Protein backbone atom coordinates (compact mmCIF):
# COMPACT_ATOMS: atom_id res chain seq x y z
CA UNK A 1 0.00 0.00 0.00
CA UNK A 2 1.27 3.47 -0.85
CA UNK A 3 1.71 5.84 2.06
CA UNK A 4 -0.82 8.65 2.04
CA UNK A 5 0.98 11.79 3.27
CA UNK A 6 -2.31 12.99 4.74
CA UNK A 7 -2.73 10.03 7.12
CA UNK A 8 -0.80 9.53 10.31
CA UNK A 9 -1.22 6.74 12.91
CA UNK A 10 0.84 3.59 12.36
CA UNK A 11 2.44 4.99 9.22
CA UNK A 12 4.63 7.35 11.28
CA UNK A 13 7.18 4.56 11.76
CA UNK A 14 7.43 4.09 7.98
CA UNK A 15 7.82 7.84 7.50
CA UNK A 16 10.83 7.81 9.83
CA UNK A 17 12.78 6.01 7.04
CA UNK A 18 12.12 8.71 4.42
CA UNK A 19 14.51 11.35 3.11
CA UNK A 20 14.58 14.49 5.22
CA UNK A 21 15.34 18.07 4.34
CA UNK A 22 14.93 21.54 5.84
CA UNK A 23 13.07 24.66 4.74
CA UNK A 24 15.52 27.36 3.62
CA UNK A 25 13.08 29.89 2.11
CA UNK A 26 9.33 30.63 2.21
CA UNK A 27 7.69 32.91 -0.37
CA UNK A 28 3.95 32.74 0.28
CA UNK A 29 2.74 29.30 -0.86
CA UNK A 30 6.18 28.38 -2.32
CA UNK A 31 8.88 26.67 -0.25
CA UNK A 32 12.55 26.08 -1.02
CA UNK A 33 13.83 22.95 0.72
CA UNK A 34 17.45 21.76 1.05
CA UNK A 35 18.15 18.00 1.09
CA UNK A 36 21.39 16.07 1.79
CA UNK A 37 23.57 15.36 -1.29
CA UNK A 38 22.25 12.40 -3.31
CA UNK A 39 18.87 12.43 -1.52
CA UNK A 40 16.93 14.74 -3.85
CA UNK A 41 13.20 14.00 -4.32
CA UNK A 42 11.68 13.58 -7.79
CA UNK A 43 9.47 16.15 -9.51
CA UNK A 44 5.83 15.84 -8.25
CA UNK A 45 6.88 14.00 -5.07
CA UNK A 46 4.84 14.91 -2.00
CA UNK A 47 6.76 16.63 0.79
CA UNK A 48 5.33 16.90 4.31
CA UNK A 49 6.48 19.62 6.70
CA UNK A 50 6.86 18.21 10.20
CA UNK A 51 5.95 20.58 13.04
CA UNK A 52 8.33 21.40 15.85
CA UNK A 53 8.46 19.19 18.98
CA UNK A 54 5.24 17.18 19.39
CA UNK A 55 3.22 18.95 16.67
CA UNK A 56 1.72 16.66 14.01
CA UNK A 57 2.75 16.95 10.36
CA UNK A 58 0.66 19.74 8.95
CA UNK A 59 1.55 21.03 5.48
CA UNK A 60 1.82 18.93 2.31
CA UNK A 61 3.72 20.33 -0.68
CA UNK A 62 4.48 19.11 -4.19
CA UNK A 63 7.96 19.35 -5.76
CA UNK A 64 7.87 21.54 -8.88
CA UNK A 65 11.52 22.44 -9.60
CA UNK A 66 15.00 21.10 -8.87
CA UNK A 67 17.09 24.24 -8.31
CA UNK A 68 20.60 22.84 -7.93
CA UNK A 69 22.80 22.97 -4.80
CA UNK A 70 20.61 20.16 -3.41
CA UNK A 71 17.57 22.43 -3.25
CA UNK A 72 14.03 21.92 -4.55
CA UNK A 73 11.16 24.35 -4.94
CA UNK A 74 7.74 23.06 -3.86
CA UNK A 75 4.20 24.44 -3.91
CA UNK A 76 2.09 24.08 -0.76
CA UNK A 77 -1.36 22.45 -0.84
CA UNK A 78 -2.32 24.03 2.52
CA UNK A 79 -1.83 27.44 4.10
CA UNK A 80 1.81 28.09 5.01
CA UNK A 81 0.98 30.14 8.12
CA UNK A 82 3.27 29.21 10.99
CA UNK A 83 6.03 27.65 8.86
CA UNK A 84 9.58 28.78 9.58
CA UNK A 85 13.01 28.34 8.04
CA UNK A 86 14.78 25.34 9.46
CA UNK A 87 11.67 23.20 9.88
CA UNK A 88 12.07 19.54 8.95
CA UNK A 89 10.55 18.32 5.68
CA UNK A 90 9.93 14.65 4.81
CA UNK A 91 10.04 13.36 1.21
CA UNK A 92 7.19 10.84 0.92
CA UNK A 93 8.82 9.14 -2.09
CA UNK A 94 5.63 9.23 -4.21
CA UNK A 95 3.27 11.88 -5.58
CA UNK A 96 0.22 12.84 -3.51
CA UNK A 97 -1.98 9.76 -3.05
CA UNK A 98 -5.74 9.79 -2.46
CA UNK A 99 -8.33 7.14 -1.51
CA UNK A 100 -10.30 5.63 -4.41
CA UNK A 101 -13.17 3.17 -4.80
CA UNK A 102 -16.61 2.72 -3.26
CA UNK A 103 -15.58 4.26 0.07
CA UNK A 104 -15.36 7.69 -1.62
CA UNK A 105 -19.06 7.79 -2.61
CA UNK A 106 -21.19 10.22 -0.64
CA UNK A 107 -18.14 11.93 0.88
CA UNK A 108 -16.46 15.32 0.41
CA UNK A 109 -12.66 15.43 0.05
CA UNK A 110 -10.00 18.08 -0.26
CA UNK A 111 -7.09 17.97 -2.72
CA UNK A 112 -5.14 15.56 -0.46
CA UNK A 113 -7.99 13.04 -0.26
CA UNK A 114 -8.82 13.98 3.33
CA UNK A 115 -12.56 13.88 4.14
CA UNK A 116 -13.85 17.33 5.13
CA UNK A 117 -17.51 16.46 5.86
CA UNK A 118 -17.18 15.46 9.55
CA UNK A 119 -18.31 11.88 8.86
CA UNK A 120 -15.10 10.29 10.12
CA UNK A 121 -12.15 8.68 8.32
CA UNK A 122 -12.31 6.97 4.92
CA UNK A 123 -10.96 3.49 4.14
CA UNK A 124 -7.46 4.11 2.73
CA UNK A 125 -6.62 0.50 1.84
CA UNK A 126 -7.04 1.40 -1.84
CA UNK A 127 -5.19 4.55 -2.88
CA UNK A 128 -3.81 5.97 -6.10
CA UNK A 129 -1.37 8.73 -7.02
CA UNK A 130 -2.88 11.82 -8.65
CA UNK A 131 -0.19 11.94 -11.37
CA UNK A 132 -0.74 9.14 -13.90
CA UNK A 133 -0.25 8.59 -17.61
CA UNK A 134 -3.18 8.78 -20.03
CA UNK A 135 -4.45 5.38 -21.31
CA UNK A 136 -2.43 3.90 -24.18
CA UNK A 137 -3.76 4.45 -27.70
CA UNK A 138 -4.75 0.79 -28.16
CA UNK A 139 -6.84 0.86 -24.95
CA UNK A 140 -9.15 3.61 -26.21
CA UNK A 141 -12.74 2.95 -27.24
CA UNK A 142 -13.97 4.97 -30.23
CA UNK A 143 -17.62 3.97 -30.69
CA UNK A 144 -20.08 6.87 -30.95
CA UNK A 145 -23.32 7.01 -28.96
CA UNK A 146 -25.56 9.79 -27.64
CA UNK A 147 -25.79 10.55 -23.93
CA UNK A 148 -29.37 11.68 -23.22
CA UNK A 149 -29.62 14.43 -20.58
CA UNK A 150 -33.38 15.13 -20.53
CA UNK A 151 -32.69 18.82 -21.32
CA UNK A 152 -34.40 19.73 -24.61
CA UNK A 153 -32.00 22.34 -25.97
CA UNK A 154 -28.97 20.12 -25.27
CA UNK A 155 -30.36 16.84 -26.60
CA UNK A 156 -31.75 18.39 -29.79
CA UNK A 157 -29.14 20.95 -30.89
CA UNK A 158 -25.82 20.01 -29.24
CA UNK A 159 -26.11 16.37 -28.05
CA UNK A 160 -23.48 14.97 -25.71
CA UNK A 161 -21.29 12.00 -26.57
CA UNK A 162 -21.11 9.07 -24.14
CA UNK A 163 -17.49 9.11 -22.99
CA UNK A 164 -16.91 12.57 -24.49
CA UNK A 165 -15.85 15.94 -23.15
CA UNK A 166 -18.37 18.75 -23.01
CA UNK A 167 -17.72 22.40 -22.19
CA UNK A 168 -20.24 24.76 -20.59
CA UNK A 169 -19.16 28.23 -21.68
CA UNK A 170 -20.52 31.38 -20.11
CA UNK A 171 -19.70 34.54 -18.20
CA UNK A 172 -20.49 35.18 -14.56
CA UNK A 173 -24.06 34.59 -13.42
CA UNK A 174 -25.63 33.02 -16.52
CA UNK A 175 -26.33 29.61 -14.99
CA UNK A 176 -23.36 27.25 -15.48
CA UNK A 177 -23.47 25.76 -11.99
CA UNK A 178 -27.28 25.37 -12.00
CA UNK A 179 -27.04 23.50 -15.33
CA UNK A 180 -24.33 21.21 -13.89
CA UNK A 181 -26.48 20.50 -10.81
CA UNK A 182 -29.42 19.62 -13.07
CA UNK A 183 -27.25 17.27 -15.14
CA UNK A 184 -26.00 15.48 -12.00
CA UNK A 185 -29.59 15.14 -10.81
CA UNK A 186 -30.94 13.85 -14.16
CA UNK A 187 -28.07 11.47 -14.80
CA UNK A 188 -28.17 9.95 -11.31
CA UNK A 189 -31.94 9.39 -11.57
CA UNK A 190 -32.28 8.40 -15.24
CA UNK A 191 -29.02 6.47 -15.75
CA UNK A 192 -28.12 5.37 -12.21
CA UNK A 193 -24.50 6.23 -12.97
CA UNK A 194 -21.66 7.11 -10.60
CA UNK A 195 -20.48 10.73 -10.70
CA UNK A 196 -17.41 12.53 -9.40
CA UNK A 197 -17.69 16.29 -8.90
CA UNK A 198 -14.54 18.41 -8.86
CA UNK A 199 -15.15 21.87 -7.41
CA UNK A 200 -12.12 23.78 -8.70
CA UNK A 201 -11.69 27.29 -7.34
CA UNK A 202 -15.38 28.14 -7.02
CA UNK A 203 -17.43 29.65 -4.18
CA UNK A 204 -17.65 27.71 -0.90
CA UNK A 205 -21.36 28.61 -0.71
CA UNK A 206 -21.98 26.91 -4.08
CA UNK A 207 -20.20 23.79 -2.87
CA UNK A 208 -22.36 23.72 0.26
CA UNK A 209 -25.56 24.35 -1.75
CA UNK A 210 -24.66 21.51 -4.13
CA UNK A 211 -24.04 19.12 -1.23
CA UNK A 212 -27.35 20.00 0.45
CA UNK A 213 -29.21 19.70 -2.86
CA UNK A 214 -27.72 16.25 -3.45
CA UNK A 215 -28.78 15.09 0.01
CA UNK A 216 -32.33 16.34 -0.57
CA UNK A 217 -32.60 14.69 -4.00
CA UNK A 218 -31.20 11.36 -2.78
CA UNK A 219 -28.02 11.46 -4.91
CA UNK A 220 -26.19 11.35 -1.56
CA UNK A 221 -27.82 8.84 0.80
CA UNK A 222 -27.02 9.89 4.37
CA UNK A 223 -28.63 6.82 5.95
CA UNK A 224 -26.62 4.38 3.81
CA UNK A 225 -23.66 6.38 2.51
CA UNK A 226 -22.37 3.49 0.33
CA UNK A 227 -25.51 3.72 -1.84
CA UNK A 228 -24.68 7.32 -2.80
CA UNK A 229 -24.04 8.05 -6.46
CA UNK A 230 -21.42 10.81 -6.26
CA UNK A 231 -18.04 11.64 -4.71
CA UNK A 232 -17.23 15.32 -4.18
CA UNK A 233 -13.76 16.87 -4.26
CA UNK A 234 -13.50 20.55 -3.34
CA UNK A 235 -10.70 23.06 -3.71
CA UNK A 236 -12.46 26.37 -3.16
CA UNK A 237 -11.35 29.85 -4.22
CA UNK A 238 -10.01 30.71 -0.73
CA UNK A 239 -7.46 27.89 -0.89
CA UNK A 240 -3.80 28.21 -1.99
CA UNK A 241 -3.13 28.07 -5.76
CA UNK A 242 -1.41 24.68 -5.41
CA UNK A 243 -4.61 23.10 -4.08
CA UNK A 244 -6.75 24.69 -6.80
CA UNK A 245 -4.30 23.53 -9.47
CA UNK A 246 -4.31 19.89 -8.29
CA UNK A 247 -7.89 19.33 -7.09
CA UNK A 248 -9.00 18.52 -10.65
CA UNK A 249 -6.42 15.71 -10.77
CA UNK A 250 -7.69 14.35 -7.43
CA UNK A 251 -11.26 14.16 -8.78
CA UNK A 252 -10.04 12.62 -12.05
CA UNK A 253 -8.02 9.97 -10.18
CA UNK A 254 -11.16 8.88 -8.29
CA UNK A 255 -13.13 8.72 -11.57
CA UNK A 256 -10.37 6.69 -13.27
CA UNK A 257 -10.63 3.98 -10.59
CA UNK A 258 -14.37 3.51 -11.26
CA UNK A 259 -13.61 3.29 -14.99
CA UNK A 260 -10.51 1.07 -14.95
CA UNK A 261 -11.09 -1.22 -11.95
CA UNK A 262 -14.88 -1.27 -11.47
CA UNK A 263 -15.38 -1.04 -15.27
CA UNK A 264 -18.17 1.52 -14.89
CA UNK A 265 -19.37 4.45 -16.97
CA UNK A 266 -18.53 7.52 -14.90
CA UNK A 267 -19.50 11.17 -15.07
CA UNK A 268 -16.84 13.70 -14.14
CA UNK A 269 -18.02 17.25 -13.49
CA UNK A 270 -15.46 20.02 -13.23
CA UNK A 271 -16.62 23.44 -12.05
CA UNK A 272 -14.66 25.45 -13.15
CA UNK A 273 -11.91 24.46 -15.59
CA UNK A 274 -10.93 28.14 -15.98
CA UNK A 275 -9.97 28.21 -12.28
CA UNK A 276 -7.60 25.29 -12.97
CA UNK A 277 -5.87 27.45 -15.59
CA UNK A 278 -5.97 30.49 -13.29
CA UNK A 279 -4.34 28.55 -10.44
CA UNK A 280 -1.68 27.26 -12.86
CA UNK A 281 -1.00 30.86 -13.88
CA UNK A 282 -0.51 31.88 -10.23
CA UNK A 283 1.82 28.94 -9.55
CA UNK A 284 3.77 29.66 -12.75
CA UNK A 285 4.35 33.27 -11.65
CA UNK A 286 5.37 32.15 -8.14
CA UNK A 287 7.90 29.74 -9.69
CA UNK A 288 9.40 32.61 -11.70
CA UNK A 289 8.40 31.50 -15.22
CA UNK A 290 8.07 34.12 -17.94
CA UNK A 291 4.36 34.80 -18.61
CA UNK A 292 2.85 34.09 -22.04
CA UNK A 293 -0.11 35.73 -23.85
CA UNK A 294 -2.43 37.80 -21.61
CA UNK A 295 -0.28 36.86 -18.60
CA UNK A 296 -1.05 33.12 -18.74
CA UNK A 297 1.57 30.47 -18.00
CA UNK A 298 3.81 29.40 -20.93
CA UNK A 299 2.87 25.76 -20.19
CA UNK A 300 -0.90 26.36 -20.58
CA UNK A 301 -1.42 23.88 -23.45
CA UNK A 302 0.72 21.20 -21.77
CA UNK A 303 -1.09 21.47 -18.42
CA UNK A 304 -4.51 21.39 -20.08
CA UNK A 305 -3.50 18.42 -22.26
CA UNK A 306 -2.16 16.37 -19.33
CA UNK A 307 -5.55 16.71 -17.58
CA UNK A 308 -7.83 16.33 -20.61
CA UNK A 309 -6.08 13.33 -22.20
CA UNK A 310 -6.76 11.25 -19.07
CA UNK A 311 -10.50 11.94 -19.46
CA UNK A 312 -11.40 9.33 -22.07
CA UNK A 313 -13.22 6.07 -22.80
CA UNK A 314 -11.38 2.76 -22.68
CA UNK A 315 -12.49 -0.79 -23.41
CA UNK A 316 -13.17 -1.20 -19.66
CA UNK A 317 -15.45 1.81 -19.17
CA UNK A 318 -15.92 5.48 -19.94
CA UNK A 319 -15.56 8.89 -18.34
CA UNK A 320 -18.00 11.45 -19.71
CA UNK A 321 -16.78 14.85 -18.59
CA UNK A 322 -18.86 18.01 -18.32
CA UNK A 323 -16.75 21.06 -17.60
CA UNK A 324 -17.95 24.55 -16.77
CA UNK A 325 -15.72 27.13 -18.46
CA UNK A 326 -15.85 30.70 -17.18
CA UNK A 327 -15.24 33.06 -20.11
CA UNK A 328 -13.39 36.21 -18.93
CA UNK A 329 -15.29 39.33 -20.06
CA UNK A 330 -17.39 37.04 -22.34
CA UNK A 331 -14.36 36.83 -24.70
CA UNK A 332 -14.21 33.37 -26.31
CA UNK A 333 -10.80 34.21 -27.86
CA UNK A 334 -9.15 34.47 -24.42
CA UNK A 335 -6.33 31.85 -24.26
CA UNK A 336 -7.97 29.88 -21.39
CA UNK A 337 -11.33 29.09 -23.07
CA UNK A 338 -9.64 28.90 -26.51
CA UNK A 339 -7.24 26.19 -25.26
CA UNK A 340 -10.13 24.29 -23.69
CA UNK A 341 -12.09 24.31 -26.99
CA UNK A 342 -9.49 22.09 -28.67
CA UNK A 343 -10.28 19.16 -26.34
CA UNK A 344 -14.09 19.21 -26.49
CA UNK A 345 -16.61 17.05 -28.38
CA UNK A 346 -19.49 19.43 -27.68
CA UNK A 347 -19.85 22.99 -26.46
CA UNK A 348 -22.86 24.37 -24.61
CA UNK A 349 -22.60 28.16 -24.78
CA UNK A 350 -24.69 30.14 -22.30
CA UNK A 351 -25.97 33.51 -23.51
CA UNK A 352 -26.35 36.62 -21.35
CA UNK A 353 -28.97 37.90 -23.81
CA UNK A 354 -31.19 34.84 -23.27
CA UNK A 355 -30.69 35.03 -19.50
CA UNK A 356 -31.78 38.69 -19.63
CA UNK A 357 -34.97 37.60 -21.43
CA UNK A 358 -35.63 35.09 -18.64
CA UNK A 359 -35.15 32.04 -20.88
CA UNK A 360 -33.52 29.30 -18.80
CA UNK A 361 -31.44 27.28 -19.40
CA UNK A 362 -29.85 30.21 -21.24
CA UNK A 363 -28.19 27.92 -23.82
CA UNK A 364 -27.44 29.71 -27.09
CA UNK A 365 -28.91 27.42 -29.77
CA UNK A 366 -26.78 28.92 -32.57
CA UNK A 367 -23.40 29.13 -30.80
CA UNK A 368 -23.58 25.69 -29.13
CA UNK A 369 -22.01 22.90 -31.19
CA UNK A 370 -21.58 19.13 -31.14
CA UNK A 371 -19.61 16.74 -33.31
CA UNK A 372 -22.42 14.21 -32.64
CA UNK A 373 -24.99 16.15 -34.69
CA UNK A 374 -24.50 14.11 -37.87
CA UNK A 375 -27.20 12.04 -39.66
CA UNK A 376 -25.17 8.80 -39.42
CA UNK A 377 -24.96 9.17 -35.61
CA UNK A 378 -28.25 10.75 -34.49
CA UNK A 379 -30.46 9.65 -37.41
CA UNK A 380 -32.08 11.62 -40.24
CA UNK A 381 -35.16 12.82 -38.32
CA UNK A 382 -33.16 14.26 -35.40
CA UNK A 383 -30.64 15.90 -37.75
CA UNK A 384 -33.30 17.45 -40.03
CA UNK A 385 -35.31 18.79 -37.08
CA UNK A 386 -32.21 20.34 -35.49
CA UNK A 387 -31.18 21.99 -38.78
CA UNK A 388 -34.67 23.43 -39.36
CA UNK A 389 -34.78 24.81 -35.81
CA UNK A 390 -31.37 26.46 -36.31
CA UNK A 391 -32.38 27.88 -39.72
CA UNK A 392 -35.57 29.37 -38.25
CA UNK A 393 -33.69 30.94 -35.32
CA UNK A 394 -30.93 32.22 -37.63
CA UNK A 395 -33.49 33.90 -39.91
CA UNK A 396 -35.15 35.49 -36.86
CA UNK A 397 -31.75 36.80 -35.74
CA UNK A 398 -31.16 38.35 -39.20
CA UNK A 399 -34.59 40.02 -39.14
CA UNK A 400 -34.20 41.56 -35.69
CA UNK A 401 -32.47 44.73 -36.96
CA UNK A 402 -35.26 45.30 -39.51
CA UNK A 403 -37.90 44.73 -36.81
CA UNK A 404 -36.15 47.19 -34.48
CA UNK A 405 -36.07 49.93 -37.16
CA UNK A 406 -39.26 49.39 -39.19
CA UNK A 407 -41.42 47.19 -36.99
CA UNK A 408 -42.95 43.74 -37.47
CA UNK A 409 -45.66 45.00 -39.85
CA UNK A 410 -43.09 45.85 -42.56
CA UNK A 411 -42.03 42.20 -42.93
CA UNK A 412 -43.39 39.89 -45.61
CA UNK A 413 -46.07 37.36 -44.66
CA UNK A 414 -43.50 34.55 -44.83
CA UNK A 415 -41.04 36.38 -42.58
CA UNK A 416 -43.77 37.23 -40.05
CA UNK A 417 -44.62 33.52 -39.86
CA UNK A 418 -40.91 32.67 -39.41
CA UNK A 419 -40.63 35.21 -36.57
CA UNK A 420 -43.74 33.84 -34.83
CA UNK A 421 -42.45 30.26 -35.01
CA UNK A 422 -38.93 31.29 -33.95
CA UNK A 423 -40.32 33.03 -30.85
CA UNK A 424 -42.29 29.86 -29.98
CA UNK A 425 -39.16 27.73 -30.52
CA UNK A 426 -37.07 30.11 -28.37
CA UNK A 427 -39.56 29.79 -25.52
CA UNK A 428 -40.00 26.04 -25.97
CA UNK A 429 -36.23 25.66 -25.56
CA UNK A 430 -36.70 26.85 -21.96
CA UNK A 431 -37.42 24.20 -19.35
CA UNK A 432 -38.19 24.03 -15.61
CA UNK A 433 -35.31 22.41 -13.69
CA UNK A 434 -35.61 20.04 -10.74
CA UNK A 435 -32.82 21.85 -8.88
CA UNK A 436 -34.47 25.27 -9.45
CA UNK A 437 -37.92 24.28 -8.13
CA UNK A 438 -37.38 26.33 -4.97
CA UNK A 439 -36.75 29.48 -7.07
CA UNK A 440 -39.30 29.06 -9.88
CA UNK A 441 -42.12 27.29 -8.05
CA UNK A 442 -42.50 25.03 -11.12
CA UNK A 443 -41.86 21.27 -10.83
CA UNK A 444 -38.82 20.10 -12.82
CA UNK A 445 -39.25 18.19 -16.09
CA UNK A 446 -37.15 15.47 -17.74
CA UNK A 447 -37.95 15.34 -21.48
CA UNK A 448 -36.88 12.30 -23.51
CA UNK A 449 -35.19 12.81 -26.89
CA UNK A 450 -38.07 11.33 -28.94
CA UNK A 451 -40.55 13.62 -27.17
CA UNK A 452 -38.29 16.63 -27.79
CA UNK A 453 -38.05 15.91 -31.55
CA UNK A 454 -41.84 15.43 -31.79
CA UNK A 455 -42.49 18.77 -30.08
CA UNK A 456 -40.22 20.81 -32.34
CA UNK A 457 -41.56 19.09 -35.46
CA UNK A 458 -45.09 20.15 -34.49
CA UNK A 459 -44.00 23.79 -34.10
CA UNK A 460 -42.08 23.76 -37.42
CA UNK A 461 -45.00 22.13 -39.29
CA UNK A 462 -47.32 25.01 -38.40
CA UNK A 463 -49.83 22.87 -36.52
CA UNK A 464 -49.43 25.04 -33.41
CA UNK A 465 -49.37 28.48 -35.11
CA UNK A 466 -52.66 29.42 -33.42
CA UNK A 467 -51.29 28.96 -29.88
CA UNK A 468 -49.94 32.00 -27.97
CA UNK A 469 -46.13 32.05 -27.58
CA UNK A 470 -46.31 32.34 -23.76
CA UNK A 471 -47.83 28.82 -23.69
CA UNK A 472 -44.43 27.42 -24.74
CA UNK A 473 -42.49 29.12 -21.92
CA UNK A 474 -41.06 26.91 -19.12
CA UNK A 475 -42.90 23.70 -20.01
CA UNK A 476 -41.68 20.12 -20.49
CA UNK A 477 -43.09 18.35 -23.55
CA UNK A 478 -45.37 19.80 -26.25
CA UNK A 479 -48.54 18.37 -24.67
CA UNK A 480 -47.93 20.59 -21.63
CA UNK A 481 -47.67 23.60 -23.96
CA UNK A 482 -51.06 22.86 -25.58
CA UNK A 483 -52.62 22.34 -22.13
CA UNK A 484 -51.11 25.64 -20.93
CA UNK A 485 -52.57 27.37 -24.02
CA UNK A 486 -56.02 26.05 -23.13
CA UNK A 487 -55.60 27.33 -19.56
CA UNK A 488 -54.57 30.78 -20.86
CA UNK A 489 -57.72 31.02 -22.97
CA UNK A 490 -60.04 30.25 -20.06
From Swiss-Prot:
GO terms for cellular component: chloroplast thylakoid membrane; mitochondrion; proton-transporting ATP synthase complex. InterPro entries: AAA+_ATPase, ATP-synt_VA_C, ATP_synth_F1_bsu, ATPase_a/bsu_AS, ATPase_alpha/beta_chains, ATPase_F1/V1/A1_a/bsu_N, ATPase_F1/V1/A1_a/bsu_N_sf, ATPase_F1/V1/A1_a/bsu_nucl-bd. NCBIfam families: atpD (TIGR01039). Belongs to the ATPase alpha/beta chains family. Transmembrane segments: none annotated. GO terms for biological process: proton motive force-driven mitochondrial ATP synthesis. Its EC number is 7.1.2.2. PROSITE patterns: ATPASE_ALPHA_BETA (PS00152). It is found in: Plastid membrane. GO terms for molecular function: ATP binding; ATP hydrolysis activity; proton-transporting ATP synthase activity, rotational mechanism. It is an enzyme of class 7 (translocase). SUPFAM superfamilies: C-terminal domain of alpha and beta subunits of F1 ATP synthase, N-terminal domain of alpha and beta subunits of F1 ATP synthase, P-loop containing nucleoside triphosphate hydrolases. Pfam families: ATP-synt_ab (PF00006), ATP-synt_ab_N (PF02874), ATP-synt_VA_C (PF22919). The lineage of its organism: Eukaryota, Viridiplantae, Streptophyta, Embryophyta, Tracheophyta. It catalyses: ATP + H2O + 4 H(+)(in) = ADP + phosphate + 5 H(+)(out). It is a peripheral membrane protein. Keywords: ATP synthesis, ATP-binding, CF(1), Hydrogen ion transport, Ion transport, Membrane, Nucleotide-binding, Plastid, Translocase, Transport. Its main location: plastid. This is ATP synthase subunit beta, plastid. Produces ATP from ADP in the presence of a proton gradient across the membrane. The catalytic sites are hosted primarily by the beta subunits. F-type ATPases have 2 components, CF(1) - the catalytic core - and CF(0) - the membrane proton channel. CF(1) has five subunits: alpha(3), beta(3), gamma(1), delta(1), epsilon(1). CF(0) has four main subunits: a(1), b(1), b'(1) and c(9-12). ATP binds at residues 170-177.
Amino acid sequence: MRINPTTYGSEISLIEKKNRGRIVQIIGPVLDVAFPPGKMPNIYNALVVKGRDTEQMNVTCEVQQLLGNNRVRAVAMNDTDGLMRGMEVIDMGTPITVPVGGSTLGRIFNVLGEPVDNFGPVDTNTTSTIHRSAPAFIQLDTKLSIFETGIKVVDLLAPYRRGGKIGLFGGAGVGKTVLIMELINNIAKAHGGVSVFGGVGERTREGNDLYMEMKESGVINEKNITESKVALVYGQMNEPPGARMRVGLTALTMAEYFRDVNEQDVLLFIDNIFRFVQAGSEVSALLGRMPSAVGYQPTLSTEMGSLQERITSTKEGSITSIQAVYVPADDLTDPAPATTFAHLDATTVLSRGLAAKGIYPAVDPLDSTSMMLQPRIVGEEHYETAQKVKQTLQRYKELQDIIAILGLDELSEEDRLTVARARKIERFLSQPFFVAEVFTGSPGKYVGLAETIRGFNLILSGELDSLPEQAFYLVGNIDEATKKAMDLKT
